[in-house]
Structures are given as structure tokens and as C-alpha cells.
């Protein structure tokens, strides 16, 4: 989605990353850039593999803590839905049956923090439609554009403290 943002950004994500791996990569991958803000979208791979929502929330809290410790403002982003059938086809990997409840739990936590609700455009969707993410997890250009529209609208409000 970063190519559709109205402000400069650096994409530090890694495909397949778990929330635990994001915590471990923080010092090496985030700190060298000395960002003022960190947009954090993580937990999808963990939750679809059956990692408990409480563990993902703990990882997100740890990333927030590390950000604040280094003078970075953490901004969490809610998790859009996935499409387990398409994930199975693309990666030959099963998805944890309770993924929806886990996503709901993590998103409820995120919505109580400084956040941008990037899942909002997809809330009425039970699963992510193929036309938005062929592989069921990584948004295609149209999904990325939809997420960027939300970020572009909400980011100025978040940094202004609204």
C-alpha cells in the first residue's frame, strides 16, 4: 500500500513474518531508519497458523514498548480478513479454523490503541475476495489502494492526536 500513500514511507515488512519475528527484527530493521512514526500491521501469519490471539497482542505490545523506548510513535493497523481456500491453493498451507475469532480479538485490542482501521473497508466481507488478493493474504493493487486511502485519511488525524 505504501506506493499509494500521500507521504514518504519505507516498507520494512517481510512476507511470511510472524508477530514474534517482527519483535525480534525491530532493533536491526527499524532503528537504523530513526522513524518518527511506525505503522504496524502484523499478526496475520501468526493467527492463521493458530498462534493464540493473546500471544499476538503481547507481541504488538512489545513492539509498541520498543517504539516508545526509542522515541517512535507506534500506530497499529487493524488486520483485514484472509481467504483460507486461496491460501491453501497458493501456498499449500492450511489455515487455523478459528482465525476469524482470533482476528476479531486482536482487532478489538488494536482499536483500543493508537491505530488506523485498515480493516474497515473489508468489514462486511466474511473472507477476503479473490479479486482483492489472489493468494488470499497479500493484497493486490486494488486492496492496497483501498488500505492506503484509509491511511491517508486517518494518519494526519492520528499524528495530530485527534
PLM feature segments, named:
Residues 25-34, 44-47, 53-57, 66-68, ...:
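Extracellular glycan-modifying ectodomains
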Residues 11-14, 44-54, 91-97:
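Surface-exposed cleft-lining segments at the edges of enzyme active sites
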Residues 53-62, 99, 103:
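Charged helix-capping and loop-helix junction motifs
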Residues 11-17, 39-47, 68, 79:
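Cell-envelope and extracellular/periplasmic
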Residues 81-162:
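Catalytic His-Asp segment of secreted/periplasmic serine-dependent ester chemistry enzymes
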Residues 1-15, 20-37:
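Serine-esterase "nucleophile elbow" of acetyl-processing enzymes
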Residues 69-74:
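A short helix->loop->beta-strand "cap" motif at the edges of active sites that frequently abuts
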Amino acid at each position: 500500500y505504501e506506493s499509494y500513500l500521500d507521504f514518504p514511507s519505507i516498507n520494512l515488512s517481510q512476507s511470511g513474518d510472524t508477530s514474534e519475528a517482527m519483535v525480534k527484527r525491530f532493533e536491526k530493521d527499524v532503528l537504523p531508519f530513526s522513524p518518527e512514526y511506525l505503522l504496524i500491521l502484523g499478526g496475520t501469519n501468526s493467527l492463521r497458523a493458530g498462534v493464540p490471539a493473546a500471544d499476538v497482542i503481547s507481541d504488538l505490545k512489545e513492539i509498541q514498548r520498543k517504539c516508545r523506548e526509542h522515541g517512535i510513535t507506534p500506530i497499529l493497523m487493524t488486520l483485514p480478513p484472509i481467504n483460507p481456500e486461496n491460501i491453501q491453493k497458493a501456498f499449500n498451507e492450511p489455515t487455523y479454523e478459528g482465525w476469524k475469532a482470533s482476528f476479531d480479538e486482536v482487532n478489538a485490542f488494536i482499536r483500543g490503541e493508537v491505530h488506523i482501521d485498515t480493516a474497515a473497508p473489508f468489514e462486511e466481507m466474511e473472507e477476503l475476495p479473490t479479486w482483492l488478493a489472489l493468494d488470499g493474504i497479500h493484497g493486490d493493487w486494488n486492496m492496497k489502494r483501498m488500505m492506503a486511502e484509509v491511511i491517508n485519511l486517518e494518519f494526519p488525524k492520528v499524528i495530530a492526536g485527534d
